[in-house]
Amino acid sequence: MYYLMNKNTVVAAFEKQPATAFSDEVLFREVERTGKLPFGFEDINAWLNSRKSSKHNAHLRKLMREMGCDDNEGFIRVTHAATINDTFWIKSDRESLTWEQISLYRNPFTETISRLAFEGVGLYAGDFSSTSPELSCEGSFRKCFRKEKQRGSFGSDIFIYKRGNDLGPGLEPYCEMLASEIAAIISPDNYVPYRTVLLHDKLASKCNLFTNEQHGYASFSKLMKAKSLQDVFDFFDRIGASQAFREMLVVDSLCFNQDRHAGNYGVLFDNDTLEITGMAPIFDLNLSMLPYVSMKDFDSIGDKLFEYAPVLGDDFTRIGQMAMNDTLHDRVKTICDFSFAFRGDDVFPPERVKAMESIIRRQAQALLSSETLRTKDVFFSQNAADDEQYQGEVRAAVKRFHIFADAVDQMELGSNVFKSDCVSSDTVQYIFEMNGYELTVDFLKRKILIADDRLQAVTPDALQDAAPAVYELYDKLFGLFTNMNQY
């Protein structure tokens, strides 16, 4: 028997299921519920899988496999499913462990695991008798957790170090630091400060942990299945956090954050009662500030921004405008002449800092505008202009199609012209292609059959001599097309 615990309180009991002929995976089934279950809990197997960091990180998946904790039974044995997000954990009925012995907040981390998770190098000889948060955290970037003597901005002695992408220029730590400067202005009471540091000779962003034994974190993905952005806003409005949610949207709009999925924002709650106490601070900003845009691309930044879109909403500028209110208006106003404290280095050069400042200032002015704007209106994009022209041509062609369809329905042509509703005609194809209105060919093919379908492409005079009835149709269509030019 196994017990799902919240600190030292049993909230559920479950047991291993008998093996099946078609699965080697050890599964569990619930036996009893005796307390409040974690947010988003559906069944014990899904909950265990959601605790594993390996679902996001291929390197940690390999590490966990070598440690024997990649399956649910091994994961319980090694980690007890403890995380730094809440105070839930698991023990077997053969163990006399207490929360005080398991808590990641109270006990030291395994340096070997921490370093392996952060550096991604081969296994070192080490003691895996204790564990570390790396095995049960979310996110695809290499990160590690360290306990330090001096506590941070949230009063915790636990700090998170997160690296950049090994396959790219590695600008993400800089971007996270810069975006947190914007967050400090827009959401001064509800953001996570980041700074850049070197750890084991690797650049990383560093922040303080905002959870503790009293207050846990639940991502929005565990709270509800929203069908629209309005559903998300309504949720935060119900818990009294609509202003905090607006602030997050504006920060993401100004910083062009592409990664605000439902796992990257959520709520804080009381670990004992599971009562929601407010919105979690704004965090996870490493995909803000255009980390994958080259310096050359800044010359045509509108084309790059045309390729991007936020996760919440469909346009960076528009969603920022929609989130604005009087309080945010005053804060965004200060961004119009904003400069970063960080002025650049060899990796993130000063000219890139200046380029980002220019973009953010222009975006701030757009958010303050009374005119409804989208990103393409603020940052000119030739690609967007070409796309808009194309869409305009399509709309005009569709309009011509409907005008033509109505006109054909009203034509009074000889009975020898129409014989079927579903047979095609080379002559009709010729009439259309001759005038460049291919969009309506299929319509007419379905509509009529020319009496002499053997006719090939001919001149109008030859058509009149060979098939007067067909020419009558051609003449009326040609006149219709000529009149369509005004549309």
Model-derived features with residue positions:
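Low-complexity, intrinsically disordered short peptide segments enriched in small/polar/basic residues
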Residues: 332, 391, 395, 405, ...
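Function-determining sites in protein domains
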Residues: 408-409, 414, 418-421, 459-470, ...
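Intrinsically disordered, low-complexity regulatory segments enriched in Ser/Thr/Pro
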Residues: 24-31, 37-38, 435-472, 479, ...
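Cys-based phosphatases of the PTP/DUSP/CDC25 superfamily and their flanking regulatory architecture
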Residues: 486-487
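Amphipathic, interaction-prone secondary-structure segments
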Residues: 406-447
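Intrinsic disorder/low-complexity segments
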Residues: 385, 397-398, 406-408, 452, ...
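Conserved protein-kinase catalytic-loop segment immediately C-terminal to the catalytic Asp
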Residues: 261, 266-268
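Phosphate/dinucleotide-binding and metal-coordinating scaffold of catalytic cores
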Residues: 1-250, 254-256, 268-393, 400-402, ...
